[in-house]
Amino acid sequence: MNEADDQQEIIRLEQARCRALVEADIDSLQKLVSDDVVHVHANGKTDNKAAYLAMVGTQIRFLEAGREALDVRVYGNTAIATGRLDQLIEMTQTAQRIDMHVMTTQVWVRHGANWQQASFQATNL
């Protein structure tokens, strides 16, 4: 693959990750994020893979998750993706809905032929 193909693949995978959040598709998320992922929420809370998947499966319902333009820079087997992420979530315990608008930085790492998200950082807009 060339750099342009890798950029498009990261964009496709991020779209798949957003879709998996809305569908609560834990199996797909399991494949998309690396075992050592560090997921930093906009409030500063940090999750490892197990905590991130548990949060998606039990604590938050993603009603919408969408991306505006995503800028992807590829450095060999590492890619950095930055862009705006808009989400409408519902807290499962309280049914409180939160409309979130964040800027994210993600690090994707290629393991063999597959890319996985190794880091996610969100900042409220």
Predicted regions and their residues:
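A beta-strand edge to alpha-helix "cap/lid" segment located at domain peripheries
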Residues: 1-31, 36-125
